[in-house]
C-alpha cells in the first residue's frame, strides 16, 4: 500500500506557492502521491501542476470528478438527455486527462440523487449505460474509472459495497473497477470490515476519511483494523487521506493524519 492525500483543485488556491507548500508539507510528512479534486479538465493547468509534482517527485494517483454535481447539476441518472450527454462528455474528458497522467478517475457523486430521478430502477439503468459508454472509451485510452459507493444522503444509487460490486461486475469492463471510502462504509455497512471479502480482484483505490470528516483519529473509524483487513485481502494500491470538515489548517491536518496512520501501524507494500 501507498499513501496519498487529497488536495482541492489548484485553481482554488490563491497562488501557486500555496499549492506547492501543501505538496512540500505532504512530502516531508511521508506521503507518496497526491489526489486532486478537479472541476473541469479543460481548465486544469497540466504543465504547471506537473512542474509542482516534479519538485517533490510525486505521482498523481487519482482525479476526483464529482464537484460539478453541485455547481452545474451534472449527473447520469436524470431523464434529461442533455444533462446526461454533458456529463458523459465531461467524464470522457476526465478519461483523457487520466490517460495523460497514467492515473485513475474516481466516479460516484455524478450518479445523482433520487431528487434527480425518483425511479431507482430507471436511474440505475441510465447510469449503467452511461458508464458502459465511458468505460469502453476508457479501454481505448488505457485509463481506469474507479466506481465509488457513496452514502444514501449524498447519492441515490449503488450506496453499498455489495451494490457497487454488482454494478462493476455486471459491466465486465477492465476499465471499470471498484474503490471504497471509509466515511461511506461507516454509514452504509452493517459490519464495517467484513465487506472487503471477495473484492480483491476489483478493488483499485481506497479513500481514508474519518467518520466525522475531520483528521484521522478524531472520529471512531477503526483505522488499525482496517489496515489489517486490507493486508489480508492483498490490497497494494493507494490509500488517499481526505479531510473535509475541520478547523485545523491544512498543514496541521496533513501532519496529524500521518501521525495517526503511523500509530495505527500503516505499512507500505
Positions of PLM-derived features:
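Active-site acidic/histidine proton-transfer and metal-coordination neighborhood
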Residues: 17, 77-177
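Catalytic-core regions built around general acid/base machinery
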Residues: 48-57, 127-137, 195, 225-229
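Histidine-acidic metal/acid-base catalytic patches
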Residues: 1-9, 13-30, 158-180, 184-269
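Active-site-proximal loop/turn and secondary-structure-junction residues that shape catalytic pockets
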Residues: 9-11, 38-40, 66-67, 111-113, ...
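Short, basic/glycine-rich phosphate-binding loops at helix/coil junctions
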Residues: 69-73, 105-111, 206-207
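N-terminal pre-domain/capping segments
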Residues: 1-95, 99, 173, 201, ...
Amino acid at each position: 500500500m501507498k499513501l496519498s492525500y487529497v488536495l482541492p483543485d489548484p485553481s482554488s488556491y490563491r497562488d501557486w506557492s500555496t499549492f506547492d507548500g501543501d505538496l512540500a508539507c505532504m512530502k516531508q510528512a511521508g506521503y507518496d502521491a497526491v489526489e486532486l479534486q478537479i472541476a473541469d479538465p479543460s481548465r486544469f493547468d497540466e504543465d504547471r501542476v506537473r512542474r509542482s509534482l516534479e519538485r517533490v517527485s510525486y505521482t498523481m494517483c487519482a482525479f476526483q470528478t464529482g464537484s460539478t454535481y453541485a455547481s452545474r447539476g451534472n449527473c447520469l441518472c436524470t431523464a434529461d438527455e442533455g444533462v446526461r450527454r454533458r456529463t458523459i462528455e465531461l467524464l470522457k474528458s476526465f478519461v483523457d486527462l487520466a490517460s495523460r497522467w497514467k492515473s485513475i478517475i474516481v466516479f460516484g457523486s455524478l450518479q445523482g440523487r433520487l431528487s434527480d430521478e425518483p425511479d431507482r430502477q430507471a436511474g440505475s439503468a441510465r447510469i449503467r449505460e452511461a458508464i458502459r459508454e465511458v468505460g469502453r472509451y476508457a479501454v481505448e485510452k488505457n485509463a481506469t474509472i474507479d466506481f465509488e459507493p457513496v452514502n444514501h444522503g449524498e447519492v441515490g444509487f449503488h450506496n453499498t459495497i455489495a451494490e457497487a460490486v454488482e454494478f462493476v461486475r455486471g459491466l465486465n469492463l477492465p476499465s471499470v473497477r471498484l474503490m471504497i471510502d471509509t466515511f461511506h462504509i461507516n454509514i452504509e455497512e452493517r459490519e464495517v470490515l467484513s465487506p472487503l471479502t471477495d473484492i480483491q480482484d476489483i478493488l483499485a483505490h481506497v479513500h481514508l476519511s474519518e467518520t466525522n470528516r475531520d483528521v484521522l483519529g478524531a472520529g471512531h473509524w477503526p483505522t488499525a483494523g482496517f489496515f489489517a483487513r486490507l493486508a489480508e485481502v492483498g490490497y497494494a494500491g493507494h490509500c488517499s487521506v481526505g479531510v473535509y470538515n475541520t478547523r485545523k489548517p491544512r498543514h496541521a491536518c496533513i501532519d496529524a493524519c500521518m501521525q495517526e496512520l503511523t500509530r495505527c501501524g500503516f505499512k507500505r507494500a
